[in-house]
């Protein structure tokens, strides 16, 4: 075995090794940055080189309608439209960021309690006030004589509702059903804890069992965007209405929703998914009490700081609707969704290789005009013999989507997010219009 020269000690060798490795790392990073790869990855896309832009780099949608076909892109990039990350709202909030800025002093939010006189004792009074106000302004939900339950996103509220509505006796787990295509996370959340209170019961369209059941009604529906009502229609059914997308940028507001349990979330109403705040409007006091009990057991309440931020954001949204000199938040959001759906429908018409749903126009009481739904997701169907649309788009187009199988539907369907940043969405349009014909 060779001897290390005396003038090189083990300490010298260690320093030399570290220097060599560090230089290699710098070279790799430099190469990544020169290729334009984003360094700040989120966990769910860490295995793919995803196109990412900062909000300041996003182009306006008005110019996108003219320029997406001229985009210069790296064909090796992966476009991830699998998740509903609402970064389409970044531009609006950057331009209006000052009015939502708030300072939270260090002594604030020390106590667990927000309002000991409220049934939901961890609900911040300011948030409760702004929730009632925004629903009154938009006209999308009845809030009078309702209990407001705040949660860490609507996902926690869904679990709380299952806990509250399930029988707590020896009758066994109650079935939970939803009509296909249903929200892909419902089965996973329902069965993740193997609860003795409830279990996933499958497609509401084919459900025939006797006895009590819980039916989830998502309207507008995720993934296909259609307005929905209950399907089973048995007298023993208990309904949960997920209304996360019942806002005027996505669908006409035809009347205030009036149901026993209604779930909403900041992530899809204002785009603030990272704050993780949702709320339920609950008609029955005992149901609300049990939902609150679940959240007590699960997380001992909900972040006060997040609640205060959402309260501030909702106030700005409501204030903007009364601003006669400028566009409201919902005007901006509607325009963005309208432009994207116009481009996608035109692409489908031009290529004839894929299709998206046709919607019925209705009059929106909020905007005072008639328009078609323009959902947060596109239920995208590959035509002409493509059996597995998700696989085709992933392997041939380098576009990540969510397969229809996760929604209880066919492999020829995929769900595509319409909420990503402009650059990603424009490259997506460019690929499906410029190279669809050459691949098929």
Swiss-Prot record:
Positions of transmembrane segments: 7-26
Gene of this entry: TAR2
Name this polypeptide is given: Tryptophan aminotransferase-related protein 2
InterPro entries reported in the protein's UniProt record: Alliinase_C, Alliinase_N_sf, Ethylene_sulfur-biosynth, PyrdxlP-dep_Trfase, PyrdxlP-dep_Trfase_major, PyrdxlP-dep_Trfase_small
Cofactor(s) it depends on: pyridoxal 5'-phosphate
Subcellular location: Membrane
One Gene Ontology cellular component: endoplasmic reticulum membrane
Keywords: Aminotransferase, Auxin biosynthesis, Membrane, Pyridoxal phosphate, Transferase, Transmembrane, Transmembrane helix
Functional summary from the UniProt entry: Involved in auxin production. Both TAA1 and TAR2 are required for maintaining proper auxin levels in roots, while TAA1, TAR1 and TAR2 are required for proper embryo patterning. Involved in the maintenance of the root stem cell niches.
Activity regulation behaviour: Inhibited by L-kynurenine.
SUPFAM superfamilies per record: PLP-dependent transferases (SSF53383)
């Amino acid at each position: 075995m060779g001897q290390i020269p005396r003038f090189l000690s083990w300490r010298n060798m260690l320093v030399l090794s570290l220097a060599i490795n560090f230089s290699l790392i710098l070279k790799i990073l430099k190469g990544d940055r020169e290729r334009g790869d984003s360094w700040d990855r989120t966990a769910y896309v860490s295995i793919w080189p995803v196109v990412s832009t900062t909000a300041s780099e996003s182009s306006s949608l008005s110019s996108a309608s003219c320029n997406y076909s001229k985009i210069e892109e790296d064909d090796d990039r992966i476009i991830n439209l699998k998740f509903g990350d609402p970064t389409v709202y970044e531009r609006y909030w950057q331009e209006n960021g000052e009015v939502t800025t708030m300072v939270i002093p260090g002594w604030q939010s020390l106590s667990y309690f927000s309002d000991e006189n409220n049934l939901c004792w961890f609900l911040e009074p300011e948030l409760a006030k702004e929730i009632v106000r925004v629903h009154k302004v938009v006209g999308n939900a009845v809030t009078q004589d309702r209990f407001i339950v705040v949660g860490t996103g609507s996902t926690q509220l869904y679990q709380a509702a299952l806990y509250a509505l399930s029988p707590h006796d020896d009758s066994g787990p109650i079935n939970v059903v939803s009509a296909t295509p249903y929200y892909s996370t419902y089965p996973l959340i329902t069965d993740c804890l193997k609860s003795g209170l409830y279990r996933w019961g499958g497609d509401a369209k084919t459900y025939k069992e006797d006895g009590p059941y819980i039916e989830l009604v998502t309207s507008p529906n995720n993934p296909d965007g259609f307005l929905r009502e209950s399907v089973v229609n048995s007298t023993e059914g208990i309904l949960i209405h997920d209304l996360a997308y019942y806002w005027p940028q996505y669908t006409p507001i035809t009347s205030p929703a009036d149901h026993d349990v209604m779930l909403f979330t900041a992530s899809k109403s204002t785009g603030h998914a990272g704050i993780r705040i949702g709320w339920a409007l609950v008609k029955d006091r005992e149901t609300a009490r049990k939902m609150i009990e679940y959240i007590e057991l699960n997380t001992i309440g909900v972040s006060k700081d997040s609640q205060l931020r959402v309260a501030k954001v909702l106030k700005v949204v409501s204030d903007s609707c009364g601003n006669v000199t400028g566009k409201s938040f919902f005007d901006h959001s509607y325009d963005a969704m309208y432009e994207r759906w116009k481009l996608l429908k035109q692409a489908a018409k031009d290529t004839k290789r894929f299709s998206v749903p046709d919607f019925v126009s209705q009059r929106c009481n909020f905007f005072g005009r008639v328009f078609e739904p323009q959902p947060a997701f596109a239920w995208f169907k590959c035509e002409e013999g493509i059996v597995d649309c998700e696989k085709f788009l992933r392997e041939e187009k380098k576009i990540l989507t969510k397969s229809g199988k996760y929604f209880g539907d066919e492999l020829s369907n995929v769900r595509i997010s319409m909420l990503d940043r402009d650059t990603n969405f424009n490259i997506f349009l460019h690929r499906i219009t410029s190279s669809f014909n050459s691949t098929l």
